[in-house]
Amino acid sequence: MKSQIYSMQSIEDAKICLEAGADRIGVLASERCGEFPCEVKEKDAYEIFRLLDGKCTSILISVGRNEEEIFHQLEYLRPNVLHLCANYTGSPSFREHMREKFPDIELMEAVGITTREESIKEALRVAEYADYLLLDSVSATVKGIGAAGVT
């Protein structure tokens, strides 16, 4: 079993997670000034990712709105995995472009669990191009998929 911990706010948070044995650590990097409660500035995310280099799998939780914005983050931050959620939905062509520019970065996409039929259909669609699926909760009051406190 792998442990995955998200929403690092500081290098200190990341150090504690590493010491606790986390296998995968995620950071939501954004310059949107508080649109998401767990976001950190890209410069802070950069420092966290450098701390994680070679110690665990680093995951960029991107809330980028388009391919250009997301690729800019990948170029600067260089995580092991890109996790798409909230503002952008991947596609086979997005994954192809990503493989061309960033062959060593894997893609994870969140699939919101709603109804059984819709969720399975969406998971099968995303599985065509994503390296990982994250099956997650959906809330009417929280933007995007996950971090909703719904279990």
Positions of the model-derived regions?
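Conserved N-terminal beta1-alpha1 strand-loop-helix module at the mouth
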Residues: 1-151
